[in-house]
Design a protein with these regions (language model features):
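ABC transporter nucleotide-binding domains
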Residues: 2, 9-189, 194-200, 204-208, ...
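ABC ATPase nucleotide-binding domains
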Residues: 219-256
């Protein structure tokens, strides 16, 4: 479903993504991990057609990302970390606009919206009576997730999808993406909540300084380095262990 070949992005003299190559088949949930500034968001923006790579290429569902950008966008869903929406619209107006942009018949779009309203336990009155700018962070997140899945895309990218969701909504969301994967959809899941990634993802890709540094099943990668947990493996590979030690030493200065 996703094939990246030597994907590279430069911003002036800064090399943000350094010749990344990987293949992701259908039906797989892949945790896309890295510390802040590693190039995760830049890579996701390239794969979703928001920015063009400086070098390299990628295909989504067999379509060339650069040559067939519009068709690629029709086949993907994307939940960005920022969760940007049109704040001057109600939730229902926004979702109906998204449905129209994807060419979904009005009745079909309204039915899909109702299904997501039920799944996320949203209030239909809230979707119709309040502007998105007045929504809570969690409510807005649910609307953005609904918009990303409304056209039933075969490939979905999530960037920090649990941000703002309460515990019950987060549990439901994790069950949702596992169901989507069983239906053959490709899920790319970027998050800093590593215990969730370890439980939900079939595979993790870890990048640092724009380069791929690990790729495999979470349990296998953890076992190979005798790390115990994915979080510990991540800190060892990305220099977080040194930061953790500095934090522990700093905390000791407060002890009587």
């Amino acid at each position: 479903m996703i094939s990246a070949q030597q994907l590279t992005k430069r911003f002036g003299a800064q090399l943000a993504v350094d010749h990344l190559s990987f293949e992701i088949p259908g039906g797989q949930i892949v945790g896309f991990l890295g510390p802040n500034g590693a190039g995760k968001s830049t890579t996701l923006k390239m794969l979703t057609g928001m920015i063009e790579p400086t070098e390299g290429t990628a295909t989504i569902c067999g379509l060339d990302l650069l040559r067939d950008t519009l068709e690629v966008k029709r086949r993907i869903g994307f939940v960005p970390e920022s969760g940007a929406v049109f704040e001057s619209l109600t939730g229902l107006e926004y979702l109906e606009m998204v449905g129209a942009l994807y060419g979904i018949p009005e009745a079909a779009a309204r039915e899909r919206i109702r299904q997501f309203i039920a799944f996320f336990e949203l209030s239909f009155e809230t979707l119709t009576d309040k502007l998105l700018g007045a929504y809570s962070k969690g409510m807005r997140r649910k609307v953005v997730i609904t918009a990303a899945l409304l056209h039933n895309p075969p490939v979905v990218f999530f960037d920090e999808p649990l941000d703002g969701l309460d515990a019950n909504a987060a549990v439901g969301f994790k069950a949702l993406i596992q169901t989507l994967a069983r239906e053959g959809k490709t899920i790319v899941y970027s998050s800093h909540i590593l215990d969730v990634v370890e439980r939900v993802c079939d595979r993790v890709i870890i990048i640092d300084k724009g380069k791929l540094i690990a790729d495999g099943r979470p349990d296998q990668l953890v076992a190979e380095r005798n790390a115990g947990t994915l979080e510990r493996l991540f800190t060892e590979l990305t220099g977080g262990a040194e930061l953790q030690q500095r934090a522990e030493n700093f905390a000791k200065t407060f002890r009587p």
